[in-house]
Amino acid sequence: MKITILFLTLLVLSSSCTSIITKTMNSKETIYLDNPAVSPSIDQNLVDIHLGHSFVQGVMSFCYDCGKACFRRGKNLARCQKFVCRCTISKLR
């Protein structure tokens, strides 16, 4: 009986610790893109946006997030290569 209660107590403690750890890991990965970028000079045609992605997430998810970030700023997606996101300066029409 004591072994069963001890086992269940350890199981509950380990599952709660696991959920806390995964919650903190997921909150660190959240990226906020609502801050507007600094307006570029007139000579530039493209604006760099650094989203902070890693190779683990892959190019497809990076380019998807890149397009969403450009759309939020009211701009078109110009290029997405080598984990560099570039939006056009011209606004959406």
Curated annotation (Swiss-Prot):
Keywords, sorted A to Z: Antimicrobial, Disulfide bond, Fungicide, Plant defense, Secreted, Signal
SS bond list: 63-80, 66-85, 70-87
CC annotations in GO: extracellular region; filiform apparatus
Record's subcellular location: Secreted
Record bears the keyword Signal: yes
GO biological process: defense response to fungus; killing of cells of another organism; pollen tube guidance
Keyword rRNA-binding: no
Signal peptide: 1-19
Family: Belongs to the DEFL family.
Name the record gives this protein: Defensin-like protein 209
